[in-house]
């Protein structure tokens, strides 16, 4: 049995049930085919036969001295190991969890429990629990790590997805774009189960995993997008895919290897819808002195900058070179100095200089005048006013679905077509 299925089993909120009926007959599960995009009935495989919705553990905060909770109805604190009740709080009562010498304190009262669970007194109640002023669904698990408190939100997968797509996309976005984001976010969550296992949870609430905003990120349109795609995930070879997404591709998405990962058969460079928004095109000028300083902090002391080498970006050429990928993104830039030459990979340069993306060309700039990159070499002359202008398209790593591209496609395509455009040869399967 695949490892990801075992991880799902370990995070189920309810007893795991088979989709086989009492007679042992398999039900049909709707699947979108990778080429036709049509919905087809298929017999379930081991990857599709689990009906309960799994839960996911979101690590909201680590290294905390205290955590403050409040609920609009009665809620309780239990020992996470024994389920023994430790505290019962009335509606609107505040619970402050602190620590002392590796021990939890509940409103100043020490308890022996090593794991705390904060949950509604009535499990059927739909009241939110507030953590540090923000409302969340599900319940909370608190653990002590390295003498500090880690706060974990245990939530059903689709409640988690609702808190993700509302934070990743605007509530006023087209419904088909929101649905595509819901399936991508749900798939990424399943793929990422156990990503932060050493810290006691599955995923973090920021861009390292997916931005998660809890109930504050929800809206009617977001909830509708999640419910209308309930349980749907993208699969390749019977496993959830690494469904990466980004803000804007700048015309062409990137293959997974272009962002420093291993090549993946379902994450290829594809043509994207131009959006002609501020997210699409950007320019950033960096002085020669700042480039030298940034390279030196990364261990490359090139001395005074003499030349920068990069093949000019040709729109529509789709030509791979030694320093560019087929999408036009930068594989490597060569910086020639008085002391040495440094070849910096595109993703590393993006991080060093704070660039929005790696699909860019370069220009020489002095004052307000700029000179284009005609032959792949930009010469510098040791003058303090010299700048290197990065002229770029797209924001983010460029891999997988472009959110603004999905926004544009939603005017003519449904969410399945959007997903099949960005993720090659995948199946969209309803898991629960």
Can you say where each PLM-predicted feature lies in the sequence?
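Conserved, single-site charged/polar hotspot
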Residues: 2-432
């Amino acid at each position: 049995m695949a490892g990801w299925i075992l991880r799902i089993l370990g995070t189920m909120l309810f007893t795991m049930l088979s989709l086989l009926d009492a007679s042992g007959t398999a039900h049909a599960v709707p699947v979108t085919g990778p080429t036709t995009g049509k919905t087809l009935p298929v017999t379930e495989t081991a990857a599709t036969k689990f009906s309960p919705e799994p839960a996911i553990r979101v690590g909201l905060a680590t290294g905390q001295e205290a955590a403050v909770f409040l609920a609009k109805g009665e809620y309780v604190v239990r020992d996470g190991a024994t389920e023994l009740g430790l505290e019962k709080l009335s509606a609107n009562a505040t619970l402050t969890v602190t620590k002392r010498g590796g021990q939890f304190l509940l409103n100043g009262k020490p308890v022996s429990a090593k794991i705390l669970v904060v949950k509604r007194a009535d499990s059927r109640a739909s009241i939110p629990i507030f953590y540090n002023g923000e409302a969340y669904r599900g319940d909370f698990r608190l653990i002590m790590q390295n003498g500090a408190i880690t706060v974990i939100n245990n939530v059903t997968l689709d409640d988690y997805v609702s808190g993700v797509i509302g934070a990743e996309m605007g509530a006023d976005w087209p419904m088909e774009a929101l649905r595509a984001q819901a399936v991508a976010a749900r798939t990424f969550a399943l793929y990422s189960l156990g990503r932060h296992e050493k810290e006691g949870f599955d995923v973090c609430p920021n861009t390292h995993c997916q931005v998660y905003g809890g109930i504050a990120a929800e809206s009617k349109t977001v909830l509708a997008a999640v419910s209308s795609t309930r349980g749907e995930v993208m699969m390749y070879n019977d496993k959830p895919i690494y469904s990466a997404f980004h803000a804007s591709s700048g015309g062409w998405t990137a293959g997974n290897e272009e962002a420093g990962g291993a090549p993946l058969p379902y994450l290829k460079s594809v043509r994207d819808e131009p959006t002609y928004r501020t997210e699409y095109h950007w320019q950033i000028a960096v002085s020669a002195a700042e480039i030298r300083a940034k390279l030196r902090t990364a261990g490359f002391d090139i001395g005074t900058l003499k030349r920068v080498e990069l093949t000019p970006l040709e729109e529509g050429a789709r030509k791979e070179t030694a320093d560019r990928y087929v999408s036009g993104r930068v594989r490597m830039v060569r910086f020639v100095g008085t002391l040495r030459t440094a070849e910096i990979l595109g993703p590393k340069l993006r991080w060093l200089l704070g660039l929005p993306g790696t699909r860019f060309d370069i220009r020489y700039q002095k004052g307000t005048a700029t000179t284009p990159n005609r032959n792949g070499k930009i010469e510098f002359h040791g003058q303090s006013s010299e700048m290197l202008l990065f002229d770029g398209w797209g924001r983010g790593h460029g891999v997988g679905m472009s959110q603004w591209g999905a926004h544009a496609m939603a005017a003519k395509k449904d969410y399945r077509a959007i997903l099949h455009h960005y993720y090659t040869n995948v199946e969209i399967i309803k898991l629960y």
